[in-house]
Amino acid sequence: MLKLISRNAINKNKIILFRLYTTTINSSNNGSTIREWKKPSLENSYDTGIMVKNSLFKNGNVPFLISNCSEKNQRPISWYTCGPTVYSSSHIGHARNYMTVDIIQRILINYFRFNIIHVMGLTDIDDKIINKSKQELISASELSKKFEQEFFEDLKSLNIKPPMFTTRVSEHIDEIIKYIEKIKENQLTYESTKSVIFDVNKFGIDRYCSLRAANQQIKSDDTLLEKDKKSSQDFVLWKAYNENIDIDGTGNPVCWDSPFGKGRPGWHIECSAMIDSIFKDHLDVHSGGVDLEFPHHQNEIAQCEGHSHSHGSGDAESTQWANYFFHIGHLILNNEKMSKSLGNVITIRDFLSRYSANSLRWICLIHKYNDPLSFSDETLQLCISKEIKFLNWFKIVRSKLKLEQTSVNKVKKTFNHSIELLNQLSETKYLIEKDLKDDFNTPSVIKRLELLMKQTNESMNSIDTDLLFNVQDYVESILNIFGLEVNSEISDHNKTDESNQFLLEKLLDFRSDVKNLAKNEKSLDQIKSKIYQITDQLRSDCQSEISLRVSDIPDKGTNKPYTVDWLDKNHIQLLNIKKQSKK
């Protein structure tokens, strides 16, 4: 019998534990000066019951609390994601980032039933965009629009839900200028050669160190302005127009008028102002790649808090602009971070020309979202094999259910045959909920589903079909929550017009090749060799073009010394990987 514990008692204990827990936040950072993360007020927050890895806190997971909200969905979760700088095709390192955010949000929305307002910011004004437009002899605007469209087409191909709002730097110039003016009014800037620079020392070095300590290496995002800065950690808010640099591929200047003079926004200020345009001075969740943690996100925090409170104001120290930062781990290729600057990228479109979107989603699911992910043929082979394993299980279960429905000799199973699997299903549901509350631990969830499938296989012939249906339905529902398409039915390729047309053309090509061979070749050995080549090529083409696999078997008097299989895309991908690994 289950012992029920009152919700009030649980919540009371959680509050006591949390208060004890937060007294030691950031108290053991080996002498570093990373500032303390301030928990949202427990009296004015909704406790989701989820523990998360928050980059603002370095010593483990923290409770995920929705501030200014006493009841579930009293208000939606505010969430901002840094989008790409749209100057070239996105690669699978980007895809890992956005697909992982998609998975986490699907869990929150479809499993835990939270509402989210998701905003993504696109950088469509940047040095890289200007330089690329010069190479292609087009305007910076035309270039950025081209790659923005490609980016969102790629997201759709990957089954990644689009954000509720997309913000573009070019559409928020007025808001950015006003945002800088407010920071300037709060006495946190200085000007140098008509550029406006954020003064970290005036803001307070202890306040600044929200993600990284002051003694860690400072990396400037604009070497041209380095000589104009008072301190290496200072960063530019408004870049003065440079006629030698800020000209696009059509010869037009990329700049705007402002109270500070002609110029364009610095990189960090763009996100801060665009977030403020929708969410104002508070954000629940900010996500992005781990490479953006410093300096970009740390500078964002400083700007937003500097915008809300002036230098020396009494309540400045109590400010916490964003409560949670989720950083997605690097995608590693050949022991290096996948990066356009390193030139070691696989574009999303190149990947999808060979593999499915589901394959990439499986890769994301079996790795912890904030850990580095090593991309290799072995990783692909593992994930595709896992997907095939799940799809084959669904086919077996559905065939069993269909057979039971149509059988006239059905034997009624007793409940005793099903009780063990029923208990295993209940335990799996309980443990998977714990996994999802443990920082969205999808690798553990997948392992638990595999174990449940194994247990189901062992008792499939002795359990009630209603229970079998419920197990199948639960496994499918979890995969659907993750955004996986799990329809195990392979399309009837041999009845499609395309397949029939292909086979007809191949048959006629084969006839023509054999006729030419008979006419032109005189040596019997040469004829035999060429026929083998032609037939092998025909078999290879059938597999690659219409997923028809022909396998030879020893001739033992049968009229058909071969077998024929219609393959799904996953099998073809796996065969291709194995073939490449042998080369």
Swiss-Prot record:
Family: Belongs to the class-I aminoacyl-tRNA synthetase family.
Species of provenance: Dictyostelium discoideum (Social amoeba)
Highest taxon, organism lineage: Eukaryota
GN (gene name): mcysS
Signal peptide residue numbers: none
Location (main, coarse): mitochondrion
Catalytic activity: tRNA(Cys) + L-cysteine + ATP = L-cysteinyl-tRNA(Cys) + AMP + diphosphate
Name of the protein in its database record: Probable cysteine--tRNA ligase, mitochondrial
Molecular-function annotations in GO: ATP binding; cysteine-tRNA ligase activity; metal ion binding
Motif 'KMSKS' region in this chain: 337-341
Residues given in the record as L-cysteine binding sites: 83, 123, 296
